[in-house]
From Swiss-Prot:
GO terms for molecular function: histone binding; histone deacetylase binding; mediator complex binding; phosphatidylinositol-3,5-bisphosphate binding; transcription corepressor activity. Residues 144-163 have a biased composition (Pro residues). InterPro entries: G-protein_beta_WD-40_rep, Tscrpt_rep_Tup1_N, WD40/YVTN_repeat-like_dom_sf, WD40_repeat_CS, WD40_repeat_dom_sf, WD40_rpt. This is Transcriptional repressor rco-1. Residues 210-229 have a biased composition (Polar residues). GO terms for cellular component: nucleus; transcription repressor complex.
């Protein structure tokens, strides 16, 4: 033990405090340096965002300029073609190459083209697809097949040498001895159109679409009677006359290829102006009856039932109309009186709100109008699309409307606030939209042959395409009632059913994994323009440019029946969400023949 007390060194605390101050000064300087770097980064980021916005604006201006220039040229070309057609044809050096069915290219939507033009321009000009007339009424040379004949025998045309070249190749069905094996099909699809001018002839084809009548199936004779020059053909025709009709072809879905005149009575149903062919290869379990015919003054572009199944709405030129399903009575006409009275303004899409109080309409003027049905006044007008609106759908809660347009966007609108809540952009025109029953997803079909599914936050969850996907533009999509599957119809003449199996709602930098195509329904002879599922998911319905409506079994892929009940393309088909007494269901069709029809279907 030391005898001297311990004392601290006097200078130690001062040295420690100095060291602490140095460290604090270093931290402060580092913080200030980081703060300056942050401010510099923020400034650089703001500058880059501003530059990016300038680039976007310039690109948008360039796109608008390009679209305006393209529209101007298309308008000038259309005007010149109309002038040439009004004068009786085009000069020989402007004669376009003949179009073959396998080479049809539908025009693009949204940048000034008119996909509906072929139908709109031919209002009332087409006759119903009747059973082909008896052979003795169509005497043809031995090497030519019977003409399809849309309205009976046409007047004999002048000799080919006296016809302008354009008419020689592009006129409709010609008289005996001067018609091609099949009439040329219009390259303009009767689906959603481009900009205005629906009532005018399309730029690239005849004013009225030449849609073929049913082609006799393979077992039937392919030519009309003629004066025999050799005993063998005469003997063959006599044998065919006494033989019973040959059986249907082996393709179980080729109902549109069958000649109803040559079918036995138990697989067909013939009425005054409509008929049904049943698939003989599968058990017959359905029957169809006409309930009401709703005559319009223009092409019927769309049909839609209310959620309670009591009303059906139609969209036509300048107005939407609502009918009572039970009586067929027209209850009201919804027409905006403030629009220009000149020209056409086709209503491309209609959709009831779930409570039935409102009807949303989309039209060529790029506006969405939400009508209060009871007061017949406009509740909301949504602006924002830059091209025609082709499709609308209400969410099941009645709060959100989805719209698809040729401007390559899907937009979501809040009906309560009147705001555009989301813009989903793609590479090509949007032809059709649908919101899933659970209100979580929105699907859209496009001219780029694919179907996209987003969640309501805007994340792309599915892209349905690939080797099993469509080979041409998709014109219609519909969710199954349980939301697990989706059906799509295309200009490739097929319907596809997709299983929506990919994970959804999870943002990812990787390309979204598409769902799986589980069925492809083949059997239509022309573009598929509209698809839907019955409320019990038992049947897929499709409407086509071939004028037919087909019922498909989603489990087997076989068609149950084909209904022919219109004189022109079936542009829209919609089932009622409600099944009536005794399991009777209803569906509506809208057509280029200026009629909508309500039908019933029931099990037998």
């Amino acid at each position: 033990m030391s005898m001297y007390p311990h004392r601290p060194i006097a200078g130690a605390p001062i040295q420690n405090m100095g060291r602490l101050n140095e460290l604090l000064d270093g931290i402060r300087m580092e913080f200030e340096s980081q703060a300056r770097q942050y401010e510099t980064c923020q400034h650089d980021l703001a500058t880059q965002l501003q530059e990016l916005q300038v680039i976007r604006e310039k690109v948008f201006q360039m796109e608008q300029h390009q679209m305006n220039v393209k529209q101007k040229y298309e308008d000038e070309i259309a005007l010149l073609r109309r002038q040439l057609e009004a004068r009786g044809g085009a000069p020989g050096n402007m004669n376009p190459p003949p179009q073959h069915p396998g080479q049809q290219q539908p025009p693009a939507i949204g940048l000034g083209s008119n996909v509906f033009s072929a139908i709109m321009a031919g209002q009332g000009g087409q006759a119903l697809v009747p059973p082909p007339p008896p052979p003795q009424q169509q005497e043809q040379p031995a090497h030519m097949p019977a003409p399809p004949g849309l309205q009976g025998p046409p007047p004999p045309p002048p000799p080919p040498s006296q016809q302008p070249p354009f008419q020689q190749q592009y006129q409709g069905p010609q008289g005996p001895g001067n018609f091609p094996p099949q009439p040329p099909q219009s390259t303009a699809s009767p689906g959603p159109a481009g900009k205005r001018g629906i009532g005018r002839p399309p730029a690239g084809g005849p004013a009225t679409p030449q849609i073929n009548t049913p082609i006799p199936y393979n077992g039937g004779p392919a030519q009309s009677p003629q004066v025999p020059t050799h005993p063998t053909p005469d003997h063959t025709r006599m044998a065919q006359h006494h033989q019973p009709p040959p059986p249907p072809p082996s393709q179980t879905n080729a109902l549109s290829e069958l000649d109803p005149d040559r079918l036995p009575n138990h697989i067909k149903k013939m009425k005054d102006d409509w008929w049904v062919i049943f698939n003989a290869a599968v058990p017959r379990v359905l029957d169809v009856e006409l309930v009401h015919t709703l005559q319009h003054e223009s092409v019927v572009c769309c049909v839609r039932f209310s959620m309670d199944g009591k009303y059906v709405a139609t969209g036509c030129n300048r107005s939407a109309q609502i009918y009572d399903v039970e009586t067929g009575e027209k209850l009201c006409i919804l027409q905006d009186e403030n629009i220009d009275l000149t020209g056409d303004l086709y209503i491309r899409s209609v959709c009831f709100s779930p409570d039935g109080k409102y009807l949303a309409t989309g039209a060529e003027d790029k506006l969405i109008r939400v009508w209060d049905i009871q007061s017949r006044t406009i509740r909301n007008t949504f602006h924002g699309h830059e091209q025609d609106i082709y499709s609308l759908d209400f969410s099941r809660d009645g709060r959100t409307i989805a719209s698809g347009s040729g401007d390559r966007t899907v937009r979501l609108w809040d009906i309560e606030t009147g705001q555009n809540t989301s813009v989903l952009s793609i590479e090509d025109g949007v032809t059709t939209v649908a919101i899933s029953p659970d209100k979580q997803f929105v699907a859209a079909g496009s001219l780029d042959k694919s179907v996209r599914v987003w969640d309501m936050r805007g994340y792309l969850a599915e892209r349905l395409e690939g080797p099993d996907g469509h080979k041409d533009s998709v014109y219609s999509v519909a969710f199954s009632p349980d939301g697990r599957n989706l059906v799509s119809g295309s200009l490739d003449k097929t319907i596809k059913m997709w299983e929506l199996s990919a994970p959804r709602g999870i943002p990812s930098s990787a390309p979204p994994k598409g769902g799986r195509c589980i069925k492809t329904f083949e059997g239509h002879r022309d573009f598929v323009l509209s698809v839907a599922l019955t409320p019990d998911s038992q049947w897929v319905l499709s409407g086509s440019k071939d004028r037919g409506v087909q019922f498909w079994d989603p489990r087997t892929g076989h068609t149950q029946l084909m209904l022919q009940g219109h004189k022109n393309s079936v542009i829209s088909v919609a089932p009622s969400p409600v099944t009536g007494p005794n399991g009777v269901g209803y569906f509506a069709t809208g057509s280029g023949d200026m009629r909508a029809r309500i039908w019933s279907y029931s099990r037998i």
